[in-house]
Amino acid sequence: MRKKRIEERPSVQQLEKELSRIKYKSRYRTVLKSTVYTLITVAAVAVLVATLWLPVLQIYGSSMTPTLQDGQIVFSVKTSEFAPGDVVAFYYNNKILIKRVIAGPADWVNMDADGTVYVNSEKLEEPYVNELAYGETNIEFPYQVPDGRIFVMGDHRATSVDSRNTAVGCVSQEQLVGKVIFRIWPLEEMGFLNR
């Protein structure tokens, strides 16, 4: 005769424990999926905001010293409204340059040999410039800004290549990335940029 194997039935406590383990595993997976989807959504929104509305830019070079230093990181805001004194970012030869708006369309810009700037025959007050300089200039002053363009200059006039040079020239609306408004790095200098 064959021996019949008798299987032991699990107790109620064992069944409840196994059911609890399975439910926990299911809840864990649900929470994990939800967290991953949330992180992906937040990352996608952050990328869209950073590229479409608030581009984040790193400063390279010394053309905007003392306002902006090499290695600093700033936010810019996409806008079509720019006024003299605003710091703007724009595309130039597959790079992004950052300069200060000096004059708008149809304005007359003049500069004397010492580096003092005049817009529409009025001396431009520039507290953001430490040292005036004529800099690298190959345009003829007085210069009238063409329609639909803005005249920009770096704050460190001796080293900046800007609208004073035909290589860069005046900046068109299509070239503009946005207005630089906020410094985020280094942390001890975090804050809004002054005009």
Where are the language model's segments positioned?
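Short gly/ser/thr-rich secondary-structure transition/capping motifs
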Residues: L132-E136
